Amino acid sequence: NDTLNMLYEAGLKMEAKDFAVGLRVCHEQEKINLSQDGEKYYQSLPAASYKLTHNTDSGIGVYSFCMCPGGYVVNASSVSGLLSINGMSNHDRGGRFANSAIIMTVGRDDFPKDEGVPECMRGVAVKEELERKAYVIGNGAIPYETLGEYKEGVLGKHSHEMNITDDFRFEPDEAFRGQTMHAPVHEILPDKLSRAFLEGMENFGHRIKGF
């Protein structure tokens, strides 16, 4: 962001472009293996991956990106007061959880018409605002919640989903690297993108059981 601002102030000719934003989702790697490889083979094959896409009724494309088998969600922030995350897998892809970004396109027509921000920098302003929200709700840590909580827009209403059965316990340290906080992730994205995210997740759930 600082680099783009510096180049703009130096007089470099610039123009706005569409970009993608989204959220990272985590699932037990074993469930992904079972869905992708089948019951007969899933225990003997390496950690499975997936690639998912969906075009929403509103015309927004939703797709998985940078899927990390047996990996971790990591804090990739580089600017004070802003939060961005990424995913990674170790060489053995041996982590208990898989994760991937589920992202949506933000078009130039979606950029706010803020007269105080140059037109070519309005996409950067959108990105910074989302990263600022993420930082605030997580108090600088990686915020997380269940999909049920996200759907209802109420933190804590579906927290039991993290501990569904005696053989499933969600421990943040097994899915994340860095500090975490159970927080209202549903407050980050604007409504238009949030609805697209949920529609995409519902579609993906019909293709990978439990997604």
Where are these regions (language model features)?
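Residues forming the flavin
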Residues: 1-211
